[in-house]
Regions:
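Conserved active-site-proximal phosphate/metal-binding subdomains
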Residues: 2-124
Length: 124
């Protein structure tokens, strides 16, 4: 999810704005056949969950999914009717960075953790 909101990512600007405007309870886990996915809450996820709760058949759910695609959200920018996959961390993303800056931030955060672990694992 973090890399969707980078300058280099080709995701539609509406998607980036949707993630930037997200809060800590903005995602929902949805079951699609035998696996779960996590999406940004929107009209699509609400309707999909309502259909599941009402006992919609796999065929009905598939037809719905075919009309509400990731392409619709990520490329066309329809962040309400398209499926917008993202992780639980979406609400923690609050800036548009370059991919290089994201990597630099990850490294800067992990180096002290590695150093602390290394000091605890040292053999006398």
């Amino acid at each position: 999810t973090r890399f969707i909101v980078t300058r280099e990512c080709d995701a539609h600007p509406n998607v980036k704005q949707a993630v930037l405007g997200a809060h800590d309870a903005c995602t929902v886990s949805i079951k699609k056949w035998i696996m779960f996915g996590r999406d940004l809450k929107n009209a699509f996820t609400q309707k999909y969950q309502e259909m599941q709760a009402a006992g919609a058949s796999d065929e009905e759910l598939l037809q719905f999914l075919n009309k509400h695609t990731m392409y619709q959200a990520l490329v066309q920018g329809d962040t309400e009717q398209g499926e917008l996959p993202c992780g639980q961390d979406a609400g923690m993303i609050n800036d548009l960075l370059s991919a290089a800056e994201v990597i630099e931030n990850i490294v800067a955060e992990i180096v002290p953790v590695f150093e602390e672990l290394k000091s605890k694992l040292s053999v006398p």
